[in-house]
Amino acid sequence: MNKQNLINQFAQLITEQPNPRSVNLDQMSALEIVQLMNKEDQQVPLVIAKALPEIAVVVEKIVAAFRQGGRLVYLGAGTSGRLGVLDASECPPTFGVNHEMVKGIIAGGEQAIRYPVEGAEDNQQAAIVDLQAIQLCSKDILVGIAASGRTPYVISGLKYAKEIGSFTVAIASNPQSAMAKIADMSIETIVGPEILTGSSRLKSGTAQKLVLNMLTTASMVLLGKCYQNFMVDVQASNEKLVDRATRIIMQATGCERAKAEQTLTQADNNAKLAILMILMDLDKQSAVDLLAKNQDKLRQTLD
């Protein structure tokens, strides 16, 4: 693409426009700045609300993929890539899943999580190499994330994923984006211009984080990774999480702390298993077998 076409393309992006409400940003006090930011941020959940039907459909696609042994893969550059990596990294400790089930890929690799990597978002071939490195396949779902909706790295990844038969999703903060035209589904989060012109780590980034929260949390809930509203598959890998698992057992069963701690130990720190052992008065192996017969869903097992 020649320089003039690029200039014209960028000029049309909502995320690159100046915000009329922040033209005097450099003259504001600290309180005025944070008040304006807070007011602008209040628009974000309202924008997300308009995209809930699309988000729900994507959740159902993710659940179906998980049940077939597929993975959820996030692909992005800069802030968008970091948010994908963040959401993916939270799934194992929160839901007890392996690190391969949800993956975050950022343009420029691991270094780009902490430092900007020059030219990474424009490297189209790198996206293909990165997806081939994790052996992306037709069972997987690829979610491309970019506020602009036109990041070359992400567009290239979406095209490659479609070629091999993966279901593809685009998350962008500009309407009718180039990414949306490629992907099977699009989630548009049109939050408008940022108070600091072009700084899409602000409202656009917040919108992306909210959407990613929904995609993984709702998917894991539908897979049976919670009971009532407790994260019963939490990996009790430190003191805080052991205490959380203990409290979850107490709240779900009504038992005393000593009983919860004892059963959690017997269940090898598996809160879901401990709850079932207490509520149905089972030994560990019987509880394991019963859960297995009910797709590892505690609610279904108890009902």
From Swiss-Prot:
Gene: murQ
Keyword Lyase part of the UniProt annotation: yes
Active site as annotated: E90 (proton donor), E121
EC number in record: 4.2.1.126
Function according to Swiss-Prot or TrEMBL: Specifically catalyzes the cleavage of the D-lactyl ether substituent of MurNAc 6-phosphate, producing GlcNAc 6-phosphate and D-lactate. Together with AnmK, is also required for the utilization of anhydro-N-acetylmuramic acid (anhMurNAc) either imported from the medium or derived from its own cell wall murein, and thus plays a role in cell wall recycling.
Other facts noted in the record for this chain: A lyase-type mechanism (elimination/hydration) is suggested for the cleavage of the lactyl ether bond of MurNAc 6-phosphate, with the formation of an alpha,beta-unsaturated aldehyde intermediate with (E)-stereochemistry, followed by the syn addition of water to give product.
Self-association and partners: Homodimer.
Family named by the database record: Belongs to the GCKR-like family. MurNAc-6-P etherase subfamily.
Organism of derivation: Histophilus somni (strain 129Pt) (Haemophilus somnus)
HAMAP family, per the entry: MurQ (MF_00068)
A molecular function GO annotation: ether hydrolase activity
Keywords: Carbohydrate metabolism, Lyase
Domain SIS stretches: 62-225
Keyword Lyase: yes
Signal peptide positions on this chain: none
InterPro entries, alphabetized: Etherase_MurQ (IPR005488), Glucokinase_regulatory_CS (IPR005486), MURQ/GCKR (IPR040190), SIS_dom (IPR001347), SIS_dom_sf (IPR046348)
Pathway info: Amino-sugar metabolism; 1,6-anhydro-N-acetylmuramate degradation; Amino-sugar metabolism; N-acetylmuramate degradation; Cell wall biogenesis; peptidoglycan recycling
Protein name: N-acetylmuramic acid 6-phosphate etherase
One BP term from GO: peptidoglycan turnover
PROSITE patterns: GCKR (PS01272), SIS (PS51464)
Disulfide cysteine pairs (residue numbers): none
